[in-house]
Amino acid sequence: MYLILLVVLAVYVTYKLITTVLPHHLLIPSQNWREKISYVVKYPKPIYLKVGTKRSSYRRRLILASENPAFYTNFINNKLKISPNDCENGDGFLNEMSRRDIDDPKRRIIYGFFHPYANNGGGGERVLWQAVKATLLADDKNICVIYTTNIEAQPLDILNKANKKFQIDGLDHSRVVFIYLRKFNNLIDGNYWKHFTLIGQLFGGILLSLEAMYELSPDVWIDTMGLPSSYLLVSLSLKIPILAYTHFPILQEDMFGKLKFQKLKDLWKFNIIKFNDYFALGKFIYWSILYYFYVYLGSKVNIALANGSWTFNHLSKIWVFNTALGNVLDVLYPPCGTEFLIKQANLNQPRSNKLLYLAQFRPEKRHALLLKEYSNFLSNNFPNVTQITNKFPTLVFAGSCRTADDTATLKFLQEQVAKLDLSRFVEFRIDISYDEVVELLSSCKFGLNAMWNEHFGIGVVEYMARGCTPIVHASAGPLLDMIGRNDQQENCLNNWKTDGGFFFKSYDDPDLDPNLQKNTETGYIKFELFDQFIDYPTFETLLKELYVNDPTIIEDSKLLKMRQIDQNRVAEKFSNKAFNKKWIEYINDLNTLEKQYREEKRTKVEQVY
């Protein structure tokens, strides 16, 4: 009994520390803060501002008053130094530091972007930097803070890389503050944890967010990397709005399908004399705890944005409380930087009869599946062919090798090409430049995607933007968001031919239901989607339909019309402009929520800091 009381007391004390003591420590500087800062500003030579453990509250005051907030990064070290320009400004700088009322029109807002791998240069970073740009464009008073673990890269290097790789130009660098996280960065890396990886990463996310808050507490928390455990302390301590941009849910209901005990009602099957059942029970408890913790974390998100319909559908099943709580759950397609591709594209130029596949050389991209079915297509329809002709297409695999595993996959594919005697008909383009990628997009007739359940698929968007007609696997992003989809229940969902491209399926698909295939035409596979039964061709059968059975489907005039439709669709849905417009709307909503949270959830003293 006493033990239970002690546990309850410990939980209560911890909760009060997190919800009352910690926010006071993070947000409110010491009583003599103005005198401390004034002393350093007026000191005849540069000295550090000694603030003890209250770096967050002091850094907030400096950033919110400074003409150059970016100066207050902690790249060199965590010590606080005042900008020479701010010292020169003297009394003007000190006056700007005055506490601001909630409705003060001069009050600035700090948007904290929690993205530890801000310098990595992938699709997630494209979203981050376009979101930062849009946030700065939304209001001159907005300041963006980037929480990163890329301690090897200086702020200007990171910004230059974003500009070069994603064409993020015109950023007001003075309003972008980098906060470097050094203590717990390894804890969010899956390779760090030998066992219980997910729970370890969640724990790491909590500690990393605490470090971020300790260095600088923002007014709005934005997670663009998918680290949901960061929402816990942010919501409890800072009491600020949270926006989460989710590329891929870390947990899904489908995961329980691999367990022996999938629901509570399945526990009646438990056999007390079977050791394996104890192990299975442990897995069920482990995944259930994680799953409902993820559900709880989702309920803390005010605006949850999914990168596409596939992710949105899964989040809708998991974050079930969001709608009931009045929170937003919506789709915001990532900015794909397609303006350049569209602007320079000549849709009327002649194209080579080639199938281009832009993808890293990884097993899940399923290059081997394409090779096997392409080989079958040739042997069944063009037996003993030795020369390239216009009667059938050739393959181009263009991609990069980032790891030793990627290199091994590439070597295997090259061996398969030799084994299948396809060397004349398959071309590999490895680690090519972006200019070479654009040249391929401009010259190849079709673009391929064979991945099962690719949640988005930016490569397909690039095909569409440059006029490379998509031939893609009918699943997830390419199916639900891209090729010929205007209405979720219609158009692309009832035919393998659409106004923007073509679909195929595979007998190797994990969601294949053998019971549906009994009366299906040879070469076609039946799938159920949104309560409809649809017959999709295999890749081999699709090529036969296009090149043997009815080549008029892909005559130049029809492909030109498809290219025009695809390009318009890209401009409307996947451009940077489309992203900016919707993002700024959400930023305005967050601005309103930030005022509301200050007024309703904070103490009178915390409100003005």
UniProtKB/Swiss-Prot annotation:
It catalyses: an alpha-D-Man-(1->3)-[alpha-D-Man-(1->6)]-beta-D-Man-(1->4)-beta-D-GlcNAc-(1->4)-alpha-D-GlcNAc-diphospho-di-trans,poly-cis-dolichol + 2 GDP-alpha-D-mannose = an alpha-D-Man-(1->2)-alpha-D-Man-(1->2)-alpha-D-Man-(1->3)-[alpha-D-Man-(1->6)]-beta-D-Man-(1->4)-beta-D-GlcNAc-(1->4)-alpha-D-GlcNAc-diphospho-di-trans,poly-cis-dolichol + 2 GDP + 2 H(+). GO terms for molecular function: GDP-Man:Man3GlcNAc2-PP-Dol alpha-1,2-mannosyltransferase activity. Its EC number is 2.4.1.131. It holds the Pfam family ALG11_N. Pathway: Protein modification; protein glycosylation. It is an enzyme of class 2 (transferase). This is GDP-Man:Man(3)GlcNAc(2)-PP-Dol alpha-1,2-mannosyltransferase. It comes from Candida albicans (strain SC5314 / ATCC MYA-2876) (Yeast). Residues 196-216, 456-476 dip into the membrane without crossing it. The gene is ALG11. One of its GO terms (biological process) is dolichol-linked oligosaccharide biosynthetic process.
